[in-house]
Amino acid sequence: SERKTERLAQVVSLCKLTELLDRHPYDLSGGEQQRAALAKILLLNPDILLLDEPTKGLDAEFKQVFGQILRTLQASGVAILMVSHDIEFCAKYADRCALFFDGNIVTEAEPRTFFSGNSFYTTAANRIARDVLPDAVTPEDVIAACGGTVEPEAELPEYQRIPPAPEKETRTVKKLPVWRKILAAVS
């Protein structure tokens, strides 16, 4: 349908896949495969996203787009749980961060508190500026604290979640009599 085609074009553009459409999936780089997987998920219009290392292979430019996509999804009511070793990305885009060790959550807080109070698992910006700016966890924090101006993120192309399709009619199935269930189990 026209609506599906329009939606597909929107997601392909958002995930910067236009130039890849004629290529075989085996010819895509790891980052391109991640973008294609993201597009596939976005087309499903999920209510919950469970992401495992979603930034692996993504270039810095698309990580920023991906972060904006996550913020847009969250603002529209999508629940997002992400497992990642990409500390810089988590510091910038996560609402809460946690550290797992030996199968347990050892510590958990909002990103600024989590990364500024952690000497082992923290961002490069925090390691560099820790003695002067202990609360700085992103390069943008350091730039702003030094009086510089941080460029606003580029606008995300128009993206909206499509409402879910109307639920299909459900048919009620007649229950089998007990004797038929027993007969089915025996045969």
Question: What do these predicted ranges mean?
Answer:
Residues 24-28, 32:
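Conserved ABC ATPase signature
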Residues 104-128:
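Conserved beta-strand-loop-alpha-helix hinge in the C-terminal portion
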Residues 3-20:
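Conserved ABC ATPase "signature" region
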Residues 49-52:
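Catalytic Walker B motif of ABC-type/P-loop ATPase nucleotide-binding domains
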Residues 121-186:
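ABC ATPase nucleotide-binding domains
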Residues 90-92:
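A short, surface-exposed alpha-helical micro-motif characterized by mixed small hydrophobic
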Residues 84-85:
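H-loop/switch region of ABC-family ATPase nucleotide-binding domains
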